[in-house]
């Protein structure tokens, strides 16, 4: 049995296995359920560590970019420059990959390859547009919350992503994994609890309403973008990731440039200077955002969106400590308790015990399907053997099964 195909041990002919069912194109077609190799584990560790560093630094760099609580630059210009940096990286890596192609492989830089890949990856325009909206919201969220709180709120994306993965990509989660996600929400809620002193209960309604709206969009939009991005990258798995990134970042640059044009129309030609108000901190912010986006593409294609979001929760500790050390933000007991529950949730979600029952049920279902398929094929072969004297054999998923007597 290989890739849902049953192979005969004599003639090497292949047929689609009756028990193979396409649950999800993006997961099943590319061996998503195979045992994780040592190289895959090393890649996952590298992705998680890199993501923790980059995601943890982002809100700190955004906070450092503010002057008197405001941005002297246009956030859209930062997003546009970030996309340009990622496009340049994708082009350089694509040229490097093309120079090291093996003999007989289809050239990556040919016009036909580029056009065909562009047609097959048009779906990447959807997450690119959603990311353009989300990148602007990252700056807006800093006006309402401190960096550590922004990271805790972003953890809400895990639950939304899980629901979207179940709806769009038909991915299944065990009961223990759903309970782990519930624990994650509890941990985030504990962190958000604040005891206000007397006389401090009045909050400006426009600011509070704007914060809630931004939080809802901040959680929903990137979650939808991540799921569509993972589906688009995995559905065209044979396409070079750097070629896919070139399309994704190209779409993102176009959307952000349209945002700049809209700003020019609204504020006047003076706002067209995309470098206005930038500082050394914003340059580091652009490089950090570019590296984070590039790393995310490897998460979505070779790892998992849930792993990506859970790894971002680890960055909360780094963000909280850094914001406390650099900006004097206080690490409350609620924050420490919330972080503890988040880590318990992460351990429970990825624990082998959380997957054992689900995998056992799947194995039983596959075994029953295989037995039913074998009985059906046995009946058909016996009928054919009684009607003809010609040699015949049956194709089984197990090559050790002997051929029928002639």
From Swiss-Prot:
Q: What Pfam families does this protein's entry cite?
A: Nuc_sug_transp
Q: Which UniProt keywords apply?
A: Golgi apparatus, Membrane, Sugar transport, Transmembrane, Transmembrane helix, Transport
Report which superkingdom the organism of origin falls in.
Eukaryota
Task: Give the Lumenal membrane side ranges.
Answer: 63-75, 170-172, 223-245, 304-323
Please report the record's description of how this protein sits within the membrane. Multi-pass membrane protein
Query: Which parts pass through the membrane?
Result: 42-62, 76-96, 149-169, 173-193, 202-222, 246-266, 283-303, 324-344
Q: Which GO terms describe its molecular function?
A: pyrimidine nucleotide-sugar transmembrane transporter activity; sialic acid transmembrane transporter activity
Principal location class? Golgi
The answer to whether keyword Mitochondrion applies is: no
Cellular location(s): Golgi apparatus membrane
* Gene Ontology biological-process annotations: sialic acid transport
- InterPro entries given in the database record: Nuc_sug_transpt
Q: Which GO terms describe its cellular component?
A: Golgi membrane
Family matches, as SUPFAM superfamilies: Multidrug resistance efflux transporter EmrE
Q: Which residues lie on this side of the membrane: Cytoplasmic?
A: 1-41, 97-148, 194-201, 267-282, 345-406
The free-text function statement in the UniProt record for this protein reads:
Sugar transporter involved in the transport of CMP-sialic acid from the cytoplasm into the Golgi.
Family named by the database record? Belongs to the nucleotide-sugar transporter family. CMP-Sialate:CMP antiporter (TC 2.A.7.12) subfamily.
Protein's recorded name: CMP-sialic acid transporter 2
